[in-house]
């Protein structure tokens, strides 16, 4: 159902060691079964935020919690580690994320949001969801695509711990932009549209 490679498990265990005791991992999906599906990984305290609709998937030293209705969408999901300009980060491959529970045919050989002809917008959303946001989530943050301009510039917006973070400019220019341009050669650049407000929520102050 949900596979986490050994290297990814070790990485998560290390991250959890810096958190409050009994902290686990939550796997959530926004708009499952649609072309706009987005998955997210975050820290989770089961005793503090108990949800009767949750199921627990146990691993050797931690557990993943998710809502029961997501089971059909996370079949054959793999969480792994990749290295790029953002450093070491989590990567999520979930081929069934965009399909309805009632779909009779699932193409497991592709992971694009739009399986027939992925647009630049959908390619970027896919990369943000599966490669970049899993890493930012460990800092309590995320980034989303606002729009693609007529000259192929991606307008992005930071959320959570990335809003007001002193490392935001470095992250978007040295990490996110390089990653997106490498995977999407037609992209001409990235602009941060966030109205940054430093505060206790910011990861780096």
Swiss-Prot record:
Cofactor annotation remark: Binds 1 [4Fe-4S] cluster per subunit. The cluster is presumably bound at the interface of two monomers.
Organism whose genome encodes this protein: Blochmanniella floridana
Name of protein: Fe/S biogenesis protein NfuA
Cofactor needs: [4Fe-4S] cluster
GO MF annotation list: 4 iron, 4 sulfur cluster binding; iron ion binding
Pfam family, one: NifU
Entry keyword annotation includes 4Fe-4S: yes
Binding, [4Fe-4S] cluster: 162, 165
InterPro entries attached to this UniProt entry: Fe/S_biogenesis_protein_NfuA (IPR017726), FeS_biogenesis (IPR000361), FSCA_dom_sf (IPR034904), HesB-like_dom_sf (IPR035903), NIF_FeS_clus_asmbl_NifU_C (IPR001075)
Keywords: 4Fe-4S, Iron, Iron-sulfur, Metal-binding
Subunit structure: Homodimer.
Physiological role: Involved in iron-sulfur cluster biogenesis. Binds a 4Fe-4S cluster, can transfer this cluster to apoproteins, and thereby intervenes in the maturation of Fe/S proteins. Could also act as a scaffold/chaperone for damaged Fe/S proteins.
Gene Ontology terms describing biological process: iron-sulfur cluster assembly; protein maturation
Gene: nfuA
Gene3D superfamilies recorded: Fe-S cluster assembly (FSCA) (3.30.300.130), HesB-like domain (2.60.300.12)
Family: Belongs to the NfuA family.
């Amino acid at each position: 159902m949900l596979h986490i490679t050994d290297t990814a498990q070790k990485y998560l265990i290390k991250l959890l060691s810096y958190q409050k005791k009994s902290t686990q991992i939550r796997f959530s999906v926004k708009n499952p079964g649609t072309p706009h599906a987005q998955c997210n990984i975050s820290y989770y305290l089961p005793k503090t935020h108990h949800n009767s609709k949750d199921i627990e998937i146990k691993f050797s030293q931690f557990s993943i919690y998710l809502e029961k209705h997501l089971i059909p969408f996370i079949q054959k999901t793999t969480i792994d580690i990749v290295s790029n300009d953002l450093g070491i980060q989590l990567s999520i491959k979930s081929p069934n994320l965009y399909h309805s529970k009632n779909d009779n045919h699932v193409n497991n050989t592709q992971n694009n949001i739009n399986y027939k002809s992925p647009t630049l917008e959908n390619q970027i959303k896919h990369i943000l969801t599966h490669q970049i946001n899993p890493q930012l989530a460990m800092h309590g943050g995320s980034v989303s695509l606002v729009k693609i301009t007529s000259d192929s510039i991606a307008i992005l917006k930071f959320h959570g711990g990335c809003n007001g973070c002193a490392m935001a400019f470095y992250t978007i220019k040295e990490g996110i932009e390089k990653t997106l341009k490498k995977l999407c050669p037609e992209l001409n650049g990235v602009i941060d549209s966030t109205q940054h407000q430093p505060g206790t929520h910011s990861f780096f102050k």
